[in-house]
């Protein structure tokens, strides 16, 4: 019985210690934690500045104290964004970045962000798979090839060859959506060059000079 209890306790201890290690192995999580710590340092500095100003006789309504408060608040917004982003894995980011590239890579930041947000809306909707990979590989929706490492590598190889930054630009749009920076109703679940679902939330026209299209973002 004693051996059984010891073994059980060891298993529990391993489980507790392995969770942070699993997260730490994910570079996105590690980067987000570092960014959060940086923002908290900024908050500490802003707080200390405000306190120092108050001791010197400045009121809370003074421009200097207000500037310190603004800095603290902006850091808090950034922390909230990084906390949301930290919930996604490297694989989630890679798959969605590849998807955004193929769906709207050479359009505008707005369109790229909207495409990413539609996918994230689907992840949160019970009618669709609850993972980024599941949404992208769902039959009849996007494309299973978007979920492959090879597809992402091909984009980056082209960037390296041509001196372009298409993958990075698409990744920025994906992270903006994951951080909650894209304004779109949660029930916008469709994106295509035609209207569908329960009506159009917004249509966006794009003309590159050699290619023109209208994208419809629709309620589901």
Language-model regions: role of each:
Residues 16-33:
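Sec-dependent signal peptide cleavage junction
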Residues 73-84:
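Signal peptide-directed extracytoplasmic domains
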Residues 84-220:
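Bacterial extracytoplasmic/cell-wall-associated proteins, especially those involved in peptidoglycan
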Residues 33, 59-72:
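Short, charged, amphipathic alpha-helical segments
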Residues 32, 39-53, 75:
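Non-transmembrane amphipathic alpha-helical segments
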Residues 47-65:
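Charged, low-complexity interaction regions
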Residues 1-4:
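Positively charged n-region of N-terminal signal peptides that target proteins for export
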């Amino acid at each position: 019985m004693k051996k059984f209890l010891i073994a059980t306790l060891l298993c529990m201890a391993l489980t507790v210690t392995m969770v942070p290690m699993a997260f730490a192995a994910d570079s996105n999580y590690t980067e987000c934690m570092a960014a959060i710590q940086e923002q908290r340092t900024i908050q500490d500095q802003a707080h200390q500045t405000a306190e120092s100003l108050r001791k010197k006789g400045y009121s809370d309504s003074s421009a200097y104290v207000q500037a310190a408060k603004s800095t603290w608040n902006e850091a808090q917004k950034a922390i909230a964004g990084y906390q949301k982003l930290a919930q996604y894995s490297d694989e989630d980011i890679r798959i969605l970045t590849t998807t955004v590239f193929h769906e709207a890579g050479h359009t505008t930041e707005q369109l790229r962000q909207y495409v990413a947000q539609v996918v994230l809306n689907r992840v949160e909707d019970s009618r669709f798979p609850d993972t980024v990979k599941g949404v992208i590989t769902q039959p009849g929706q996007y494309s299973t090839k978007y979920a492959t490492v090879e597809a992402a590598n091909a984009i980056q190889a082209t960037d390296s060859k041509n001196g372009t930054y298409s993958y990075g630009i698409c990744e920025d749009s994906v992270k903006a959506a994951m951080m909650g920076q894209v304004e779109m109703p949660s029930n916008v679940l469709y994106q295509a060059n035609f209207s569908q679902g329960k009506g159009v939330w917004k249509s966006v026209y794009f003309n590159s000079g050699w290619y023109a299209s209208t994208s419809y973002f629709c309620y589901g």
